[in-house]
């Protein structure tokens, strides 16, 4: 019975792929959680509607259909989890750790402002993956206070994560 289950699961994920060997199990789990957040209708495929919905939850209400189409067309077909993981694997090959983290934030910043809404980031960090505690959120906002519009500079956060100190103002 177990082999049948494994075969069905393999088919549901789009066949077997060595893409899973590119990542550690913990990384795969984190990508799965990100995929689940984006797959708003939970059908196992990321569509334009899923992207529109997740961007709307981040306050990006005026995303053009062409922009969504371009995002979806980066894949050769329907974006299931295996395709999603493969796309990330291709983008991250040989990437600098800071670039990897910035790229992850850029998914949440389609207008390329370099910022993300405080409320949205807090919701993600307290409800997904390794959930932040209230104390951890307090420390984050003390270290990286949002601007008056409630935006957080994620590039500075990425720099500190990878270099351990705050970047000098240019």
Swiss-Prot record:
Keyword Protease carried by entry: no
Signal peptide (from-to): none
Molecular-function GO terms, alphabetical: calcium ion binding
UniProt-listed PROSITE patterns: EF_HAND_1, EF_HAND_2
One BP term from GO: skeletal muscle tissue development
Pfam families, per database record: EF-hand_6 (PF13405)
Domain of life: Eukaryota
Entry annotated with the keyword Zinc: no
Chain residues that bind Ca(2+): 39, 41, 43, 50
UniProt keywords, alphabetically: Calcium, Metal-binding, Motor protein, Muscle protein, Myosin, Repeat
SMART domains from the UniProt entry: EFh
Gene Ontology terms: cellular component: cytoplasm; myosin complex
Positions of the EF-hand domain: 26-61, 96-131, 132-167
InterPro entries: EF-hand-dom_pair, EF_Hand_1_Ca_BS, EF_hand_dom, Myosin_RLC
Subunit and interaction comment: Myosin is a hexamer of 2 heavy chains and 4 light chains.
Protein name: Myosin regulatory light chain 2, skeletal muscle isoform B
